[in-house]
């Protein structure tokens, strides 16, 4: 059966603690609010009158995202509304009462979408293969459909800084491209704007905050338990770097916001042929250069 933690307690834990330990959760909450607020401001994530849909999975990231947005909403410079939405994918042993109980206790407007994507994924994906890609596409489609039907203007996802860096290396290692996760983007069909307010937040801080708040975590039994996934391997690499070279992952995250196209080799982003004069004269293409090389090779 799925393990579920109890409902969250106030940040000020009533148990006897030293003054330093009493202050630490409050400092962490302040640090997270600052990071989330900074990301919202830097990328223009929330505008006046926005209806923000927080995609709530029951994991530590989405709980923290919702908690931060609720706190910021009280003092935000612009008015916006929140709705928490969970997709019940009909996974075996999924505790369907946990999220509604939590959200009612927090007085958060919410909806539960019931769609049996679990059966679809289990039927289509061979046993032992990674389910994450198909599961993600089906989940995204269901959430986009809800957003379209309910006037949602922003879709908030719980990806954090470490997710973004890990995606960069996933693309680098397995797809030979430089790409990560944008903090704000428009969906491929142009109908939805997706935001990632945790873009500046470290996963370790989220884990500590979730523990301090005693969120009722629901583990993912579908994909989270599969071993040897490429993303897990990259995650272990980043954790090792954090242990052996503190600050390295922070530097990589900052580098994603300081791109120099002219110092890369993407010909669609920079006019390399136009450098060095002679830009008005037509330049031979690769076939012209290779023809001479082929002739030399034939003579040899």
Curated annotation (Swiss-Prot):
It is found in: Cytoplasm. The thiolation reaction likely consists of two steps: a first activation step by ATP to form an adenylated intermediate of the target base of tRNA, and a second nucleophilic substitution step of the sulfur (S) atom supplied by the hydrosulfide attached to the Fe-S cluster. Belongs to the TtcA family. One of its GO terms (biological process) is tRNA thio-modification. SUPFAM superfamilies: Adenine nucleotide alpha hydrolases-like (SSF52402). Its EC number is 2.8.1.-. Pathway: tRNA modification. A motif (PP-loop motif) lies at residues 57-62. Its cofactor is Mg(2+); [4Fe-4S] cluster. Binds 1 [4Fe-4S] cluster per subunit. The cluster is chelated by three Cys residues, the fourth Fe has a free coordination site that may bind a sulfur atom transferred from the persulfide of IscS. NCBIfam families: PRK10696.1. One of its GO terms (molecular function) is ATP binding. It is an enzyme of class 2 (transferase). Pfam families: ATP_bind_3 (PF01171). The keyword Cytoplasm applies. This is tRNA-cytidine(32) 2-sulfurtransferase. GO terms for cellular component: cytosol. The keyword Secreted does not apply. Homodimer.
């Amino acid at each position: 059966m799925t393990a579920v933690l109890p409902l969250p307690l106030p940040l000020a834990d009533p148990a006897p603690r030293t003054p330093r330990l009493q202050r630490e959760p409050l400092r962490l909450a302040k640090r997270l609010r600052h990071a989330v607020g900074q990301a919202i401001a830097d990328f223009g994530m929330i505008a006046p009158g926005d209806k923000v849909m927080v995609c709530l999975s029951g994991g530590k990231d989405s709980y923290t995202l919702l908690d931060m947005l609720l706190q910021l909403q009280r003092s935000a410079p612009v008015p916006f509304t929140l709705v928490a939405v969970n997709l019940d994918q009909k996974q075996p042993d999924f505790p369907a009462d946990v999220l509604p109980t939590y959200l009612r206790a927090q007085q958060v407007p919410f909806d539960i979408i019931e769609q049996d994507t679990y059966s679809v994924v289990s039927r289509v994906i061979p046993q032992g293969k990674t389910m994450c890609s198909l599961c993600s596409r089906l989940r995204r489609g269901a959430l986009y459909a809800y957003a379209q039907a309910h006037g949602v203007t922003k879709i908030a996802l719980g990806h954090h800084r470490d997710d973004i860096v890990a995606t960069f290396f996933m693309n680098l290692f397995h797809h030979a491209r430089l790409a990560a996760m944008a903090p704000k983007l428009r969906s491929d069909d142009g109908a939805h704007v997706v935001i990632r307010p945790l873009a500046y937040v470290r996963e370790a801080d989220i884990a500590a905050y979730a523990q301090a708040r005693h969120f009722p975590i629901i583990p993912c039994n579908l994909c989270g338990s599969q071993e040897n996934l490429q993303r897990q391997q990259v995650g272990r690499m980043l954790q090792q770097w954090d242990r052996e070279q503190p600050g390295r992952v922070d530097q990589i995250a900052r580098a994603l916001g300081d791109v120099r196209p002219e110092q890369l080799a993407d010909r669609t982003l920079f006019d390399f042929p136009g450098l060095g004069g002679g830009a008005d004269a037509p330049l031979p293409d690769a076939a012209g250069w290779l023809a001479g090389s082929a002739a030399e090779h034939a003579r040899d």
